Amino acid sequence: MNYEFDLHTHTIASGHAYSTIKEMANSAKEKGLKLLGITEHAPTMPGTCHEFYFSNLKIVPRVINGQKMLLGTELNILDRDGHVDLSESIIRDMDVCIASIHPPCFQQDRSKEEVTRAYLNACENPYITIIGHPDDGRFPVDYE
């Protein structure tokens, strides 16, 4: 299979990855990716970036060593209403916003109904472009 892009990646800034943005760009270029998205975890995830990090993304080049880049975040869906952990004033300037449910950040009932409601409500946010790993078995989803 030939992949042309990867939009769900993390650097050392997220606290659990090992490469810098520049190293990720170089690796993506070596692999022949046409587009690389860097989407660090938003602040509710323990050990990750402060909101100032995301405000500063606007100064990072969108082409690094010839590799086209999108810079954004992996937001944490916090509740059944689909609220996320960065403000609209920050996420509206990002190239890509993934919204995901993670165990340390979603402290709501994890029933299929509540998780599905959380994802559907998050989809109403005009700045969210991708739903991250909805197949996580810890958070059952009604696909019907």
Regions found by a protein language model. Name each.
Residues K34-L35, T39, T129:
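Short acidic/polar active-site loop segments enriched in Thr and Asp
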Residues N2, A42, G47-E144:
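Extended substrate/RNA-proximal surfaces in nucleic-acid metabolism proteins
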Residues H16-T20, K112:
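Glycine-rich anion/phosphate-binding loops
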Residues K22-L36, N56-V60:
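Alpha-helical scaffold segments that flank or form the walls of functional sites
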Residues L7, T39, G132:
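Single, functionally critical "micro-switch" positions that shape active/binding sites
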